[in-house]
Amino acid sequence: MKIAFLDIETTRLVADNGLGFILCCSMKIWHEKKIKTVRIDASKDYKKCLYNDTFVVDGIADWLIKEDPEVIVTYNGDFFDIPYINTRRLGANKKPLPPCRYMDHFKTSRYNLKLHSMGLNAMAEHLGVVHHKTRFEPIVWQRAMFGSKPDLDKIVHHCELDIVVLEECHDKVLPVLRKLKGVL
């Protein structure tokens, strides 16, 4: 079964008010080394319009169509990442993401484990995975939002590391996912 991991980094928690947009998205196929990251500053029109994330949402859809995973694994993606991407796509007069089966490990944390917190960091620390999430002050996101390449580079690294941590956690929690017996 082909499984993909996906994570986005955004400027706000809402996607429709003109202030929220996607800075980058990292995606990876399970147990492959290559991480595909689409970042807002890679658009040829980026300097003209710092908040136009159409290049990013197109890149996400293009990669998912090309790779055609059967399952997309996220952390809080059912509530945040996927609706955010679809909100941005629909707002740009694009079709929503192609249909796919989603696995959200936020739900794994909530319904299959009993951790002190339901965040990815708590899961990663408890499971003893090799990599760890990064943390930044809000000013890093603010500067990235206003075009600071060094700060956007930090956000991109953070997003790519989230994918690695998510995959490591995924490998460790698979045995507790009762609904997937015989599937994975």
Model-derived regions: residue spans:
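Entry/capping segment at the start of metal-dependent catalytic domains
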Residues: 1-35
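Conserved beta-strand scaffold positions in the cores of enzyme catalytic domains, especially
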Residues: 3-5, 35-37, 102-103, 131
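Acidic active-site catalytic centers that drive phospho-/nucleotidyl reactions
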Residues: 7-9, 81, 104, 162
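Short amphipathic alpha-helical segments
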Residues: 17-18, 85-87, 171
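Short helix-capping/linker segments at secondary-structure and domain boundaries
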Residues: 33, 115, 175-178
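Conserved DEDDh/DEDDy metal-dependent 3′-5′ exonuclease domain
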Residues: 36-117, 121-122
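Acidic, Mg2+-coordinating catalytic module of metal-dependent nucleases/exonucleases
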Residues: 72-73, 122-184
